[in-house]
Structures are given as structure tokens and as C-alpha cells.
From Swiss-Prot:
Annotated SUPFAM superfamilies: Cap-Gly domain
GO biological process, alphabetically ordered: microtubule bundle formation; positive regulation of microtubule polymerization; protein transport into plasma membrane raft
Start and end residues of each stretch annotated as Disordered: 1-53, 129-182, 302-336, 1251-1272
Region (Important for tubulin binding): 97-101
Designated name of the protein: CAP-Gly domain-containing linker protein 1
Gene: Clip1
Compositionally biased spans, kind Polar residues: 146-182
Gene Ontology CC, one term: microtubule plus-end
Key words, A-Z: Cell projection, Coiled coil, Cytoplasm, Cytoplasmic vesicle, Cytoskeleton, Membrane, Metal-binding, Microtubule, Phosphoprotein, Repeat, Transport, Zinc, Zinc-finger
Post-translational modification: Phosphorylated. Phosphorylation induces conformational changes by increasing the affinity of the N-terminus for C-terminus, resulting in inhibition of its function thus decreasing its binding to microtubules and DCTN1. Exhibits a folded, autoinhibited conformation when phosphorylated and an open conformation when dephosphorylated with increased binding affinity to microtubules and DCTN1. Phosphorylation regulates its recruitment to tyrosinated microtubules and the recruitment of vesicular cargo to microtubules in neurons.
UniProt keyword annotation of Coiled coil present: yes
Location(s), subcellular: Cytoplasm; Cytoplasm, Cytoskeleton; Cytoplasmic vesicle membrane; Cell projection, Ruffle
Positions where Phosphothreonine occurs in the chain: 50, 181
Length: 1391
């Protein structure tokens, strides 16, 4: 089954689908339709490509029309979960869709309910299509088939013409049997080619075997035909080949399951997988029937055809024919001579006796010549048979020798391939080592870059230190200047400033001491670390030196081992060359002996011998060329191997040198870096010492500053004392005026002192500013110190990075040492492999010695067989001589000979059938071995696909069933409602109508009665009036006026009463008429309502009918799908039963919902179980595949052993068969000999009696002599016919010997020995299992016998449509089914 579903837009034809139960077209109409089907089918296979093109054409958001009549926008394009293949999701303009963008719980896009629909992209169009375009015009391309295609089909389907040199047979035989030349030499060629191709069949490239339409092929090894179809099919997955067979052994006429793939006669079409079909053009695939047909044609060849064939048998037959032709004119000449002698000597009886004697002598001479010719022919045939047997044995030996040599060459090739693999591995190792060396170089370069950066950093640090030194010198000068100023001016003030300065100086001193101690500790740790690193580097360098020395030693040992191995390889190759040369020499000697034996033969066999010589020379030249090519290949491979080994050694040396150089460079760089780092550390130490000296100088300055501060303190104390004195003086100023002058003087002094204080304050401010500047400078120095600390930290970090890099280098060196160790192990492995190869060479040499011993044994067997053949030839010559003696007096023995010929033909047919069976068995065995893996893969794929398809189809069917059930329920409810409404309305209208009618009828009856009564009353009154008038006129005189007035009053009263009654009746009539009008209007309204209800009912009936039709179409579709799912339903019977139960229980909605939830849960559980089962199955498949691979390997080994045993057994059985056949022939000939001896005795007695009668009746007339002559001529003709029969028998025996030799050469000698039942039972193969590629199942039937591709019954079923022929049946162009129009189609391809 194909993965992708075909697109819905098929070319709409009027042919029904295969599953539908509709009319079939008649034979007259079906013929052109069948002719057009191949052209339609030709465009069928690339449906998936067209579908992909449709998907590529459309874009999301594009406006399209579904089926040409439903407008909308594309919202989704791609694959879905509800069905395989490409789908398009469309949002329709109107709510005519089926969903809201989600199907089966998976959302693909969002839209309003009933506006979303999913369909195939092939059903979308960008324009609105009219109904005729959507329905009719699409059929044009599919229906119109060109006459060229039909003509081509008829030309291709015609059988190939037979060759001119073969006699024409009836039409069926020409179609059945492939053309084959009747030459026996060609048969021997094909036999030899088949032998060579038995060994080389597997080596034919796939490119040469690619099938094409029109190729001549074999299906299953026995059924010949022509390829008519190649590609994928709908009934099974994979590539299939449709073949039109030569014989009616097929299953169909090119169509399977309603889809036509090609056109042919019924029972001539057959579908098979591509791997089961083989071309006939290859020598290995010549059918056994072709060989048998060729043999039959050779046996039935006329002398005219024998003249055309230059084979040995034809030459012998030519000689026999020539002898018979040359003997006839001699007979006629002798007859003319005898007739002339009789004409001269008619006069007496003595003349008759002399003529009879002369005739007898002439007959004896003819018989002697015939015996000589027969003996020559027998010798030639026996010699040819011996030569053919020798050739067959020589070919067998040669083929075995070639196979052995090929096996050995294959072993050598495998060894060379192993050596090449080792080379590749060594090259990979070299490349890895190169990469590692490059990585090391890259890291060394990185280290050099980091060292350069460190050098730059050290230079910058040196410059900073120089600047700091300059700053320190300047500050020292400033301190000296401050000291001088302080010494020069020591005022009593500024005590507070000096205290703050002293505190700051003490803090700075503490910081400097801490920094100094930290710096000293770091320097000591760094020195210790550098010492340890240097020691570790020295150790690593020593280890690297030792590793490099070891690698060099190992390389030298490997070189020596490689040289030794190359020498051993060259020695082994020389030994092989010598052995091959000896084998070639022995083969040439054998061929020369065969040539000598051929040269001893008859001159007529020279053509065949020349062909054999040319074949042998060709084989020898091919063998020599192959040996030379193999030797050249070995030399080239050996030289290339040596060159590669040399290049590998050179590369190893280069890599080692590069490693040593890189190590030395790394060492030098490390030494230089260490030296530079030591110099830098010494510089930093010197600078630190200088800084310490400067710090000491600052301490001295601080001590001086303290002394100055103490002096200032003394001054301040003196000032305080002076102030106290001034206070005392002020107090004394009041008491003593004399002290004013002193006060003034003191004031002056005070003013001077104040001035000095002011000066001191100004100096103090200056000194404070200087102190601030000094503090700033100290802060800057602190910053510089922090920078130095940062630089030291950076240096420490660089040191740490260097340490890490040193560690990485150590690890790399360790890894290189490990790689060296691994290289050593690899080299040891290579050495071990070389030892293994040496052992293999020793084994091969021992096998060669065994083969030589086998050759000597075979030569001894050949000699024994030659002796046996000589004995058989001698026995055959004796038998032929006996037969010749018997045939001198032979009589009516033609019937027995024909029986013998018939028996021989039957035996030959049985032999041919056995050969066909053997070829079938061999092909089936090889095919089974090849197809085990394919079967497993197909089984997995088919199971997965079946599971997927089953789930998808199950979901689709469930959804469709739910939809159908909903529609059915709604339609049924609507129908019931409408029916109820209609029945109620009809019943109500009927009752009302009847009641109204009854009332009206009653009213009419009453009114009519009243009218009648009134009319009668009026009539009576009128009559009374007239009577009264007449009475009044008559009785005027007699009656009085009062009576008249009373009568008149009574009459007037009655008249008024009648008038009132009339008015009442008129009013009642008017009322009744009004009521009638209203009733009529109501009636009309009810009639209109009834008409409307009828129309509604008709519309609803039409809808119901359409629903029914849709339901029928859906039922048909469901039936088709059920037919398609029949195979799956066999596997899923339980699920089908559960679904059937659910279908029966679908009547109630509540039960449906409950069961739906239950089923969903069960489905989830089933899916889980299926996933678990799949996992288990995958595990089991993996284990089975492993076991299959193991069994296949064992089978291949056993097959190889069996083939060897078969080759030996075929030779022995061929000999047994020849011996048995000759024994049976000898027995039959002995029985014929006994019968012929009896007949000869009877003939001798008859001759004696004839002689007596001649002696007694010597004086008879010439009429008796003529009768005797006629009798003798008839006997001579009979003997000639017997000779011809014997020649034919000899030819048949020759053909039989050739067939036996061919069977022995083809390896089919097992079937010839059909009498050895015990041997057959022992060595019979197990019958292969049947397997169908379509159904993917074992043991049921073969692919060729699959019922799915069987042709349907030729008798079409009777039509079930019983409508009128004038009416047009509704036909849907979308579904291609009858029952509804395209406008009313509910497309199943949408979701």
C-alpha cells in the first residue's frame, strides 16, 4: 500500500470504481476504454509530485475556491495527524464547512464554527469553475487517448519475430518459446558461460541489470516475458514490475483491483517485485526453457538447417547425409548397368542367374560400404563424445582451479585491504600527533605573548619607580628646606599643627612598616615557588628527553620490523608467482595434451576443435592477463605501501625533531623568562631598600620636628606667663601711676611681641600649607604604593597563570608520553598483525600443497575415467558392429525404434523438468537468502504502516459513523415530525372539510325543502285566488260582501305571512351564501395550505431521498473501505466486534456518550499497549535480526560447502547417468539384436527358398525377374530407411550425451540421476518457504499466485438498475459514482 493517498481530482470517466456494484460497459464499448486506460495510467504515478506542486503553488492567506464553487481563504498548508499527505485548511465565506479549524482535538487554525474545512490542495482553484468545466471538461485529457499510444501498445504487446533459420511453429508456440539458435556449439558456449556466470553472477553490477520497459525478463527463473510496467502500485508498497508473459501462466490482464497498469491478454499479466525479475540478456539468466527449446530444435532440425550449423554433431550428420546422397547415384548407375546387361542377356535363364548374382554382389558391396561408413560415423561420434567429456572435465577442473585462485586472490585482497586500513590508522595517528604538536606550539606562542606583556608591564613599572624616586628626591629637598626654615624660625605657636603632623607621620610609618613586612613575606614565598618550579621543569625536561629517546628507539625497531615484513611479503609474492607459473604451465601442458588428442580426431571436427582451441586460448590469455594485472596491482600496492611507510617514517622523524626543537625553544624561553623575572625582582628589592632608607630619613626629620615642637611649647608657656604678668600689671596700674611709663614700654614690647606673633602666625600658616602639600604628596605616594601593590598583584597573577601553564605543559607532556605508549602499543599490534599475516601465508602455502595433492588425485581420477571411457567406447564399437551385422538382415523394426525414440524423448522431458525444478530451487534458495533482510524490513514497515493506517481509518470511520448517525437521527426526527404534522393537518382539514360539507349539504337540503314548500304554498294560494275570483264572480249575487271581505282579509294575512316567510328564506339564503363564500374561501385557503404542505413534503421527500442516496453512497464507500480493511480486520477482529456492538447500540445518545468516553479510554490504553508491544516487537526484531545475520552467515558458509560438494557430486552423477543410460541402451540394443537375429534367420530361410525356386523355375519369364528386382529394391530401400533411423538414433544419443555434459557443467547433474532416490533424499535441500510481497505473509502463497492481483471474473454481474432507459441517471464527477449529482456531493475527502 502506498503511503500517499491519490488526489481527489481524477480524470472523470464513465467507468465505475472497482468496488461499486454498478453496470459494466459492454464489450464493444469496453475495448476503446481499455485502450485509453494505459495513457491515463501513464499520468497516474506521479500524483505525489503533482500534489507537491499544488502545495508549492498555494500560499497561506490566498483566496481560493474548493471544488470550484466554495470560496474562502487558505489558513493552513502542510501535514496533519488525521490523514497522511499534504492538506489545506480553508476558512469558507459561508458556514458550509465541517469544523472550526480543529480535527480530532488537534487545532490547526482558528475560525468560526462550520466555516473551516480541510481538503487536498489538488481540489483548490484560484477561479470559479462552471459546472461544465468542473464536470465535463476535466475528462477531456484523460479520455482522449492518442492513436500513437495505442499503436505503440499494440506494437509492444506483439511477440518478437522468430529467426529465419528456425522453422515456424504455430502462433502460440512462437509466442511461448524464445528464439534460440539450433547450433550445438552455441549450446556448449552458453553452458560454459553459465558455468562461469554461476561464480560471477553476484559480481554483476546493478547498473547493468537496470530494467526498462520492453526488456525481455524472467519471473521466478521460469516464466519468460516482456516488461510492460515499472513503478509503484496501489495494491502494495515498493517498486513492482508488470510483465506480459509468453504463456498464459499469469494472474491478470495488466489491471489489479480496478486500476490498470498495462494492457495484455487475460492470464498473460503478472506483477512481481523488481528483485525477483531478471533480464534474459545476461548469460547467467538464460532460462532453462530456452535451452530445452534449443535442444528440441536441434533434434528436430532438417538437413537444410544442419547445413547452416557448423557444430560437430551437424558435421557428423552432414557426413551421413553426404554418404547417403553419394550412395544413391552409385546405386542408380549400377542399376542402369544391370538393366543394360539384362537387355543384352534376356534370352536365357543363365542370363537371369548371372544378373541375380551380380545384383547380390552389388548389394553386398553396398552393405559393406554402408558398414564402413557406419563404423566411421560410430568412431567419429565416440571420439567426439570422448573429447567432449574430456573438455567438460577439463573445464570443470579449470573452473574449480579458477575459483580456488579467485578465493585466494580474495584472501590476498582482504589482507591488502587490512594493510591499507592499518596505513590509514597510522596516518590518522600521525595527523592527531601533528594536531597536538600544533596545539603545543600555539600554547608556547601564547606564553611568549604573555611574557612580552609581562616585559612591557615590568618596563612600565620601572618607569613608575624612577618617577617615584624623582618624587622622593624632590620631597627630600623640600623636607630639608622645611628643616632650614624651622631652624631659622622657631616660633612659640603652631603647636596644634605640629601635633596633627606628628600623628599623620606616625600612621604613615606604621603603614610603611606593614607594607615592608608583607613585601618581604611575598618575596620569600616567590623565591621558594620559583625554586620548586625550576626543579619541576628540570625533571620534566629530563623525562621528555628519555621519552624522545624511547620513541626514536621504537621507531628504529618499527622500521626494522617493517623492512622484515616487506621482505617476507616479497618472498610470499615470489612464492605465489612461482606457484601460479607452475599452475599455468601444468594447465598449458594439459591444454596441449587436449590439443594433441583433438588433432588425432577426424578432419570433419576441425571447426569445433578450432573453436575450442580459440576458447581455451582466450581463457588462457584472460587468465594470464588477470594474473599479470593482479601481480601489477600487488607490486603497485607493495610499492605504495613501502612509500607510505617511508613517508610515515619521515613524518615521524620530522614530528620528533619538531617536538625536540619546540621543547628546546620552550626551555630557552623559560630560562630567559626566569632570568628576566629574577632581574626584575632584584630591581624591585633595590627600590624597596631605597624606599626604606628614605623612610628612615623621614623618621629623622620627624624627630627634629618633635624637638622644634617642644621649643614651640616652651615659647607658648612663656607667653602664658607673660599674660599673667600683664594681668598683674593692670591690677597694679590702678594703685601705682608710676608704672604707666613701664606699662607704655611694656605695651610697646607687647605690640612688638604681637607683631612677632603675627609673623609667627603667618609663618605657621605657610608651614601648615606646606604640611598640607606634604600630606598631599604623602597621599599621592600612598596611591603610588597602592599602584605598586596592584602591579605586584598583577605580577602574582601572571605568576599564577605561568604556574597553571606549566601545569598544563606537564599534563601535555604526560599526554604525549601516554600517546607514545599508545603508539608503542599500536606498533606492537601492527607487529602482531604482521605475525598473523605470516601465519596466514603459511596456512595458504599449506593449502596450496593440499591443492596440489588434490590435483594429482584429480589427474589420477581423470586417467581412470579415460580408461573407463576407452572401455565404453570399445563396448560401444562392438555393439555398433553387432547392430550393423544385425541391420544387414533387419526387417520391420521401425515401430520398436519409434517406441525407443518416444521413450528417449519422455526421458529427456523428465530430465528437462528436473533441471527446471533444480534451477527453481537454486533461485528460490538464493532469493530467500537475499530477501531475509528485506522481508524483516518490509515486515517492520508494513506493521507500522498497517497500524498507522488502521488507526487513521478507524478514526475516520468512527467520525463518519458519528456524523452519519447524527444526520440519520436528525433526518429521521424531522421526517417523523413532518409526517406527524402532515397527518394531523390532513386529518384536521379532512374532518373540517367533511363537517362543513355536511353542514352545507344539510343547509342546502333545508333551504331547498323550504323553497319547495313556499313555491307549493304560492301555487296553492294562486289557485285559491283564482278559484275565489271565479267563485266571487259566480256568487256575487249569492254571497255577501262581508264574506268576501273576510276571505280577502284571510288571504291578505296568509299572503303577508308567506311574504314574511319568503323574506326569511331569502335572508337565510343570503346567510347561507355568505357562509358558502366563507367556506369556499376557507376551502381555497386549506387547499393552498395543503398544496404548500404537499410541496414541502415533496421537498422533504427529495431531501430524504438525497439523504438516502448519500447514505447509500456512504454505505458503498463504507463497504469499499470495509473491503479494503478486510485484511486488517482479520488481525483486529476483537476491535471490529466491539465497533459492531457500538454500532448496534448507537440508537440512544446517552449510551453513545458513555460508551464513547469508555472507548476513548480503551483506545488510549490500547495505544499504550500498542506502543509497549511495538517496543517489545522492536526488541524482538533486533534479536531476530541478529539471529538472522548469524544464521545467514552460517548459511553462506554451508552453501559454499554444499556448492563444493555439489560440484564433486555432479561429476560423479553425470558419470553414473551416462553409464546407466548406456547400459539401458545396450540392453535395448541387445533385445533388438535378438529380435533382428530371428528376423535374419527367417530372411535367410526365405532367400534359400527363393534360390530353390529360381533354380527350379529358371525358365520363367522376364516378368518374374522384374518382380524379384522390385522386391530386392524394396528391401534395399527398407535397409536404407533402417540405416537412416540408426543415424537418427546416433544423433539422439549424441544430443543426450551433450545434454548430460551440459547438465554436469551447469551443476544440475543431481536431477539427471533420478534413479538414485537414496542419494537424492540425503542431499535434497529443504523446500523454501512461500512468501508474498503483496500480503507480506509466509506460507500462504507466492507473490505470483497472490489472489489480489488475480483477474476478476470475466462474466460481469447483472445490472441492478431497472429504471427507464430514457431517464438520465444522476452521476457525480467528483466521486465517479452513480446515485447523486456533483452539486449534491458530500465530499469524503474533506474533514
Amino acid at each position: 500500500m502506498s503511503m500517499l493517498k491519490p488526489s481527489g481530482l481524477k480524470a472523470p470517466t464513465k467507468i465505475l470504481k472497482p468496488g461499486s456494484t454498478a453496470l459494466k460497459t459492454p464489450a464493444a464499448a469496453a475495448a476503446p476504454v481499455e485502450k485509453t486506460i494505459p495513457s491515463e495510467k501513464a499520468s497516474g504515478p506521479p500524483s505525489s509530485e503533482t500534489q507537491e506542486e499544488f502545495v508549492d503553488d498555494f500560499r497561506v492567506g490566498e483566496r481560493v475556491w474548493v471544488n470550484g464553487n466554495k470560496p474562502g481563504f487558505i489558513q493552513f498548508l502542510g501535514e496533519t495527524q488525521f490523514a497522511p499527505g499534504q492538506w489545506a485548511g480553508i476558512v469558507l465565506d459561508e458556514p458550509i464547512g465541517k469544523n472550526d479549524g480543529s480535527v480530532a482535538g488537534v487545532r490547526y487554525f482558528q475560525c468560526e464554527p462550520l466555516k473551516g474545512i480541510f481538503t487536498r490542495p489538488s481540489k483548490l482553484t484560484r477561479k470559479v469553475q462552471a459546472e461544465d468545466e468542473a464536470n465535463g471538461l476535466q475528462a477531456a485529457p484523460g479520455r482522449t487517448a492518442s492513436p500513437l499510444s495505442t499503436a505503440a501498445a499494440t506494437m509492444v504487446s506483439s511477440s518478437p519475430a522468430t529467426p529465419s533459420n528456425i522453422p515456424h511453429k504455430p502462433s502460440q508456440s512462437t509466442a511461448k518459446e524464445p528464439s534460440a539458435t539450433p547450433q550445438i556449439s552455441n549450446l556448449t558456449k552458453t553452458a560454459s558461460e553459465s558455468i562461469s556466470n554461476l561464480s560471477e553472477a553476484g559480481s554483476v553490477k546493478k547498473g547493468e541489470r537496470e530494467l526498462k520497459v520492453g526488456d525481455r525478463v524472467l519471473v521466478g527463473g521460469t516464466k519468460a516475458g516482456v516488461v510492460r510496467f515499472l513503478g509503484e502500485t496501489d495494491f502494495a508498497k515498493g517498486e513492482w514490475c508488470g510483465v506480459e508473459l509468453d504463456e498464459p501462466l499469469g494472474k491478470n490482464d495488466g489491471a489489479v483491483a480496478g486500476t490498470r497498469y498495462f494492457q495484455c491478454q487475460p492470464k498473460y499479466g503478472l506483477f512481481a517485485p523488481v528483485h525477483k525479475v531478471t533480464k534474459i540478456g545476461f548469460p547467467s539468466t538464460t532460462p532453462a526453457k530456452a535451452k530445452a527449446a534449443a535442444v528440441r530444435r536441434v533434434m528436430a532440425a532438417t538437413p537444410a538447417s544442419l547445413k547452416r550449423s557448423p557444430s560437430a554433431s551437424s558435421l557428423s550428420s552432414m557426413s551421413s547425409v553426404a554418404s547417403s546422397v553419394s550412395s544413391k547415384p552409385s546405386r542408380t548407375g549400377l542399376l542402369t548397368e544391370t538393366s543394360s546387361r539384362y537387355a543384352r542377356k534376356i534370352s536365357g535363364t543363365t542370363a537371369l542367374q548371372e544378373a541375380l548374382k551380380e545384383k547380390q554382389q552389388h548389394i553386398e558391396q553396398l552393405l559393406a560400404e554402408r558398414d564402413l561408413e557406419r563404423a566411421e560415423v560410430a568412431k567419429a561420434t565416440s571420439h567426439v563424445g570422448e573429447i567432449e567429456q574430456e573438455l567438460a572435465l577439463a573445464r570443470d577442473g579449470h573452473d574449480q582451479h579458477v575459483l580456488e585462485l579467485e578465493a585466494k586472490m580474495d584472501q590476498l585482497r582482504t589482507m591488502v585491504e587490512a594493510a591499507d586500513r592499518e596505513k590509514v590508522e597510522l596516518l590518522n595517528q600521525l595527523e592527531e600527533e601533528k594536531r597536538k604538536v600544533e596545539d603545543l606550539q600555539f600554547r608556547v606562542e601564547e606564553e611568549s605573548i604573555t611574557k612580552g606583556d609581562l616585559e612591557v608591564a615590568t618596563v612600565s613599572e620601572k618607569s613608575r619607580i624612577m618617577e617615584l624616586e624623582k618624587d622622593l628626591a624632590l620631597r627630600a629637598q623640600e623636607v630639608a628646606e622645611l628643616r632650614r626654615r624651622l631652624e631659622s624660625s622657631k616660633p612659640p605657636g603652631d603647636v596644634d599643627m605640629s601635633l596633627s603632623l606628628l600623628q599623620e607621620i606616625s600612621a604613615l610609618q606604621e603603614k610603611l612598616e606593614a607594607i615592608h613586612t608583607d613585601h618581604q613575606g611575598e618575596m620569600t614565598s616567590l623565591k621558594e615557588h620559583f625554586g620548586a618550579r625550576e626543579e619541576a621543569f628540570q625533571k620534566e625536561i629530563k623525562a621528555l628527553h628519555t621519552a624522545t629517546e624511547k620513541l626514536s628507539k621504537e621507531n628504529e625497531s618499527l622500521r626494522s620490523k617493517l623492512d622484515h615484513a616487506n621482505k617476507e611479503n616479497s618472498d610470499v609474492i615470489a612464492l605465489w608467482k612461482s606457484k601460479l607459473e607452475t599452475a599455468i604451465a601444468s594447465h598449458q601442458q594439459a591444454m596441449e595434451e587436449l590439443k594433441v588428442s583433438f588433432s588425432k580426431g577426424i578432419g570433419t571436427d576441425s571447426a569445433e576443435f578450432a573453436e575450442l582451441k580459440t576458447q581455451i586460448e582466450r581463457l588462457r590469455l584472460d587468465y594470464q592477463h588477470e594474473i599479470e594485472s593482479l601481480q601489477s596491482k600487488q607490486d603497485s600496492e607493495r610499492s605504495a605501501h613501502a612509500k607510505e611507510m617511508e613517508t610515515m617514517q619521515a613524518k615521524l622523524m620530522k614530528i620528533i625533531k619538531e617536538k625536540e626543537d619546540s621543547l628546546e625553544a620552550v626551555k630557552a624561553r623559560l630560562d630567559s623568562a626566569e632570568d628576566q623575572h629574577l632581574v626584575e625582582m632584584e630591581d624591585t628589592l633595590n627600590k624597596l631598600q631605597e624606599a626604606e632608607i628614605k623612610v628612615k630619613e623621614l623618621e629623622v626629620l620627624q624627630a627634629k620636628y618633635t624637638e622644634q615642637s617642644e621649643v614651640i611649647g616652651n615659647f607658648t608657656s612663656q607667653l602664658s606667663a607673660v599674660k599673667e604678668k600683664l594681668l598683674d600689671l593692670d591690677a597694679l596700674r590702678k594703685a601705682n601711676s608710676e608704672g604707666k611709663l613701664e606699662l607704655e614700654t611694656l605695651r610697646q614690647q607687647l605690640e612688638g611681641a604681637e607683631k612677632q606673633i603675627k609673623n609667627l602666625e603667618t609663618e605657621r600658616n605657610a608651614e601648615s600649607s606646606k604640611a598640607n602639600s606634604i600630606t598631599k604628596e604623602l597621599q599621592e605616594k600612598e596611591l603610588v604604593l597602592t599602584g605598586l601593590q596592584d602591579s605586584l598583584n598583577q605580577v602574582n597573577q601572571v605568576k599564577e597563570t605561568l604556574e597553571k601553564e606549566l601545569q598544563t605543559l606537564k599534563e601535555k607532556f604526560a599526554s604525549t608520553s601516554e600517546e607514545a605508549v599508545s603508539a608503542q602499543t599500536r606498533m606492537q599490534d601492527t607487529v602482531n598483525k604482521l605475525h598473523q599475516k605470516e601465519e596466514q601465508f603459511n596456512v595458504l602455502s599449506s593449502e596450496l600443497e593440499k591443492l596440489r595433492e588434490n590435483l594429482t588425485d584429480m589427474e589420477a581420477k581423470f586417467k581412470e575415467k579415460d580408461d573407463r571411457e576407452d572401455q565404453l567406447v570399445k563396448a560401444k564399437e562392438k555393439l555398433e558392429n553387432d547392430i550393423a551385422e544385425i541391420m544387414k538382415m533387419s526387417g520391420d523394426n521401425s515401430s520398436q525404434l519409434t517406441k525407443m525414440n518416444d521413450e528417449l524423448r519422455l526421458k529427456e522431458r523428465s530430465v528437462e523438468e528436473l533441471q527446471l525444478k533444480l534451477t527453481k530451487a537454486n533461485e528460490n534458495a538464493s532469493f530467500l537468502q537475499k530477501s531475509i533482510g528485506e522481508v524483516t524490513l518490509k515486515a517492520e514497515q508494513s506493521q507500522q504502516q498497517a497500524a498507522r493506517k488502521h488507526e487513521e481509518e478507524k478514526k475516520e470511520l468512527e467520525e463518519k459513523l458519528l456524523e452519519l448517525e447524527k444526520k440519520m437521527e436528525t433526518s429521521y426526527n424531522q421526517c417523523q415530525d413532518l409526517k406527524a404534522k402532515y397527518e394531523k393537518a390532513s386529518s384536521e382539514t379532512k374532518t373540517k372539510h367533511e363537517e362543513i360539507l355536511q353542514n352545507l349539504q344539510k343547509m342546502l337540503a333545508d333551504t331547498e325543502d323550504k323553497l319547495k314548500a313556499a313555491q307549493e304554498a304560492n301555487r296553492d294560494l294562486m289557485q285559491d285566488m283564482e278559484e275565489l275570483k271565479t267563485q266571487a264572480d259566480k256568487a256575487k249575487a249569492a254571497q255577501t260582501a262581508e264574506d268576501a271581505m273576510q276571505i280577502m282579509e284571510q288571504m291578505t294575512k296568509e299572503k303577508t305571512e308567506t311574504l314574511a316567510s319568503l323574506e326569511d328564506t331569502k335572508q337565510t339564503n343570503a346567510r347561507l351564501q355568505n357562509e358558502l363564500d366563507t367556506l369556499k374561501e376557507n376551502n381555497l385557503k386549506t387547499v393552498e395550505e395543503l398544496n404548500k404542505s404537499k410541496e414541502l413534503l415533496s421537498v422533504e421527500n427529495q431531501k430524504m431521498e438525497e439523504f438516502k442516496k448519500e447514505i447509500e453512497t456512504l454505505k458503498q464507500a463504507a463497504a469499499q473501505k470495509s473491503q479494503q480493511l478486510s485484511a486488517l480486520q482479520e488481525e483486529n477482529v476483537k476491535l471490529a466486534e466491539e465497533l459492531g456492538r457500538t454500532r448496534d447500540e448507537v440508537t440512544s445518545h446517552q449510551k453513545l456518550e458513555e460508551e464513547r468516553s469508555v472507548l476513548n479510554n480503551q483506545l488510549l490504553e490500547m495505544k499504550k499497549r500498542e506502543s509497549e508491544f511495538r517496543k517489545d516487537a522492536d526488541e524482538e526484531k533486533a534479536s531476530l535480526q541478529k539471529s538472522i545475520s548469524l544464521t545467514s552467515a552460517l548459511l553462506t558458509e554451508k552453501d559454499a560447502e554444499l556448492e563444493k560438494l555439489r560440484n564433486e557430486v555432479t561429476v560423479l552423477r553425470g558419470e553414473n547417468a551416462t553409464a546407466k543410460s548406456l547400459h539401458s541402451v545396450v540392453q535395448t540394443l541387445e533385445s533388438d539384436k535378438v529380435k533382428l537375429e530371428l528376423k535374419v534367420k527367417n530372411l535367410e530361410l526365405q532367400l534359400k527358398e527363393n534360390k530353390r525356386q529360381l533354380s527350379s523355375s529358371s525358365g520363367n519369364t522376364d516378368a518374374q525377374a522384374e518382380e524379384d528386382e522390385r522386391a530386392q529394391e524394396s528391401q534395399i530401400d527398407f535397409l536404407n530407411s533402417v540405416i537412416v533411423d540408426l543415424q537418427r538414433k546416433n544423433q539422439d544419443l549424441k544430443m543426450k550425451v551433450e545434454m548430460m555434459s551440459e547438465a554436469a557443467l551447469n551443476g544440475n547433474g543431481e536431477d539427471l540421476n533420478s534413479y538414485d532416490s537414496d542419494d537424492q533424499e540425503k542431499q535434497s535441500k529443504k523446500k523454501p518457504r512461500l512468501f508474498c510481497d503483496i500480503c507480506d505473509c509466509f506460507d500462504l502463497h507466492d507473490t505470483e499466485d497472490c489472489p489480489t492481483q488475480a483477474q476478476m471474473s470475466e462474466d460481469p454481474p447483472h445490472s441492478t438498475h431497472h429504471g427507464s432507459r430514457s431517464e438520465e441517471r444522476p452521476y457525480c464527477e467528483i466521486c465517479e459514482m452513480f446515485g447523486h449529482w456533483a452539486t449534491n456531493c458530500n465530499d469524503d475527502e474533506t474533514f
